[in-house]
Amino acid sequence: MAMQHMLGFTIHPATGGGNPYVVIGVGSNRTALAPTNAPDDSYWICIINAKNPRVMVKDWIIKGSDNSKVPPGIDTYMNDPEYIFVVATKTLSTLHVPQGAFFDFLTKYGAGPELQKLEQLNVVYGCGNYGNVSYALTGQCGPRGGGKPNPPSYEKGSIYGGYSALMMMSLMPGPNGAPPYSLCDTYTWTSP
C-alpha cells in the first residue's frame, strides 16, 4: 500500500513581534492559524478540527501573569478525540512559566521534559539571567487515564529568548487517505 498524502504541520511560538501561529500544508497550499493580537508574555491555546485541520475551532489567550489558571470550558474540547490541540507561547517571561493547576493541566495532556527544563531554568536562575523562553505542545485531544493509553502528545522548549521552539511535524490521514488526521512526529509530508 502506498504512503498516504500527509500535510505539513508547523508550530511557531513567537519570540518577538508578531503572533504565534500554526501552518498546515506547504507552499501555496498552506493555511496559517493564529490568534488576533496576542500580547507579549502569553500562551495561545488553539483547538483544531482533526477532520479538517485547516479549521481552528476555538482558541484562548492566557496572560503570563495568569500562569496558574486553566481556561474555563477548555476540557470540553480537550476530552474530545475529534480535535487536535496546540499550545504556543509569545515572548514568555521565565517568571511566568506554568504553575499549579495550569502546570498540572499541561502535564495531563503531555507536557514533560521540555516544560520541566523551563521550570528548572526559572527556579535555578530566576527571571534575571534568561528573560524569555519559548514553548510548544501539541497532541490529539481525547480522554486521559482510565487504564487506556493516552493519545500522543509532543513538546519542544527553548531557553534562548531569541530562538523559537519551532516544531515541524506532519498530519497523517487514516489508512484510506481520508480524515480524521493524526499527528506524526516526523516531517514526512508529501507534495500534492
Regions found by a protein language model. Give the residues of each.
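Short acidic-hydrophobic catalytic motif
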Residues: 1-192
